[in-house]
Amino acid sequence: SRQWLFSTNHKDIGTLYFIFGAWAGMVGTSLSILIRAELGHPGALIGDDQIYNVIVTAHAFIMIFFMVMPIMIGGFGNWLVPLMLGAPDMAFPRMNNMSFWLLPPALSLLLVSSMVENGAGTGWTVYPPLSAGIAHGGASVDLAIFSLHLAGISSILGAVNFITTVINMRSTGISLDRMPLFVWSVVITALLLLLSLPVLAGAITMLLTDRNLNTSFFDPAGGGDPILYQHLFWFFGHPEVYILILPGFGMISHIISQESGKKETFGSLGMIYAMLAIGLLGFIVWAHHMFTVGMDVDTRAYFTSATMIIAVPTGIKIFSWLATLHGTQLSYSPAILWALGFVFLFTVGGLTGVVLANSSVDIILHDTYYVVAHFHYVLSMGAVFAIMAGFIHWYPLFTGLTLNNKWLKSHFIIMFIGVNLTFFPQHFLGLAGMPRRYSDYPDAYTTWNIVSTIGSTISLLGILFFFFIIWESLVSQRQVIYPIQLNSSIEWYQNTPPAEHSYSELPLLTN
């Protein structure tokens, strides 16, 4: 209907992002189950390594560009930023709509790329020469490149919109230092997107012309260099991983201070500086993804130490969350369970990241399952736990309905066991030398792969249970009476759900 197709309302567009992200998340999860099914036993299950790598590549692209980013930035960002700023809507409401509607075509292009020729079995990094015209003939990689172009344009437009909204549409009394931490996290994320995505666009456009227009940007035969592609890709790729986690940081700050009964997060100014520092440092560490391509020892030393420095602002955030929790009598609501799980498991993922930052160690661990375990701890148990925490926390505000708390707690326990059982054994596999992106492995790795596959099955059951919980809530229509006690953030002063046009008059915020 016209309401959804041509919407200029930040709440409706945010809801569209949530639905799209949930749908894409189902596709991405299905692909991950295929990966674990293939690896659950030595020997072939699905086919050859090409089809396996097409599945791995699509799993990564869908989870990153069509699940985490649309939900965190498009869903939570659109819904909460205007409400937290006291703004009537986003700065550019129609551009907001276009940002969303670029995503379904982008996802379609990605899905089509796997259905023509042999698919794009390049890994999400799309390194040439594997992604170049000889090793990947046909249209698959070209379609994947166009998919990334559209998703990138969508994110850049969204970033411009968020930055403009935050600069121009803050309500009276909301100075930058008093702005909610979630809004800060989104605006820093938007800056990272704005600065990193054009570099990715340049890299994949050069790859496109190498494949189709006979250029040789990445072909040594014509004076090009495939390592140039790696530098360009990771100059985008590393900020991207901070783009995926920063909005989560913002949400966790709100949930922890709210559930602790505190009026603000411990050291909120320090939290802002920490996020700014993470955003800045994220741009100067990219070559730690390239320790095995033969860089000078002094270059490796720089990237090792610069990478470790990111642990400092990250540590500030972790300890400030713990300080916010300090001295509180917690009631273990589902939202705080996810937030506590986030703090613990994100820390585990961060510690394995510090291990990998050592270039000499990384030369051994690069392209093994240790790296897979590391980034799934910070994504599958960082970003996804933050999404779960945020969804449960703000669901009563968005819908005016309640979820079944007892079921939500059971669901948390199922997921917690599932994801840890899936990814913790992968540290052992990596230390034992099992390489990434292979569909088969020697018998010695069988035991931990079986454990990992069982864990992924438990996680799948947990996700299905969660969708049932949402269905039950929507069907039962239990209206919220009081959404929350002791509001620490102004979005809770809205009706539940908020009026279609909140803040028709400019609110004045005082101390």
UniProtKB/Swiss-Prot annotation:
Mg(2+) binds at H366, D367. O2 binds at Y242. GO terms for molecular function: cytochrome-c oxidase activity; heme binding; metal ion binding. There is a cross-link at H238-Y242 (1'-histidyl-3'-tyrosine (His-Tyr)). Ca(2+) binds at E38, G43. It catalyses: 4 Fe(II)-[cytochrome c] + O2 + 8 H(+)(in) = 4 Fe(III)-[cytochrome c] + 2 H2O + 4 H(+)(out). The keyword Heme applies. The chain crosses the membrane at residues 15-35, 54-74, 100-120, 143-163, 181-201, 232-252, 266-286, 303-323, 336-356, 378-398, 412-432, 450-470. Fe(II)-heme a binds at H59, H376. Its EC number is 7.1.1.9. PANTHER family: CYTOCHROME C OXIDASE SUBUNIT 1 (PTHR10422:SF18). This is Cytochrome c oxidase subunit 1. The gene is mt:CoI.
